[in-house]
C-alpha cells in the first residue's frame, strides 16, 4: 500500500513560487494553515474574509495579517465585490474555503447558513466562469456535506451527500 507521504514527495510544490494565490476564507482554521504553507512556498497570497468573523488561532499566532500580501474584508455573498476583486488580482490559483461551518449556528439560522455556503459558492463559480484569464479553482468543503449515517470511520467520496 502506498502511503500519502509518498505522493507528497512526488508533488511539485514549486508551482506556487511567485504565483498569485487567492484564498477565500483565509482567516479560518483550514484557510490560515493553507495561507501559511503557501507563504512558505513563496507564493504571493491574497485573502478574502470578513473581519467580523473570529480569526482562527493559527491566523492570530502566526501573525498572518502581517505576512499575507493583501487582505480584503467583505462578505462572499457580495457578487460585485467578489467579481471586482478577482478581476483586479487575476490570481493563478483560487482556493475557496469560506463557509458558515458551525452546526449549532446552522440550526439557529439556516437561511444565513444557506446563503453563505450555497450562494457564496455559486458566486465564485459564476465569477470564474466569466473571467478572461486562466486560473485554477479548488473548492473545499467539510464532511458535514455528507449524509449523517453515524459512521465510526471517515467518509468516502462515494458516500451520499
State where each predicted segment sits.
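N-terminal Rossmann-like NAD(P)+-binding domain of SDR-like oxidoreductases, especially those catalyzing
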Residues: 1-161
